[in-house]
Amino acid sequence: PGLVVLAGFMRILTPAFVQHYQGRLINIHPSLLPRHRGLDTHRKALEAGDDVHGASVHFVTAELDGGPVIAQARVAVNPGDDEEKLAARVLAREHELLPQVVAWFAEGRLAMRNGQVCFDNRALSGPLQC
């Protein structure tokens, strides 16, 4: 396949699989990476007192949630938020973010070169904000 998309996959991939699809394997993660890698991201954001939380789409590498971040969508953490309320707002942004990144890839606008995200043939200094 030209692109493998992980969404809610919740499994560790083998190094051979990741290497085989290097640059063609993306994941959506419910935090503003590199902050709050792994599980329970909404709880972690609330416990840390974060003012902003969100979602990231990144290229998958051997490091868990450690690949180059392509794009992010932010949401405010509101007073009175609990995990469920925050998760619902983040999920809504994920549903906007992931199709946009897939479209950019399909249009040939997005690539990973030398471990760096390139958009419109230019290396990015940070994630695209959506």
Regions inferred by a protein language model and the residue ranges of each:
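Donor/substrate-binding cores of folate-linked one-carbon enzymes
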Residues: 3-120
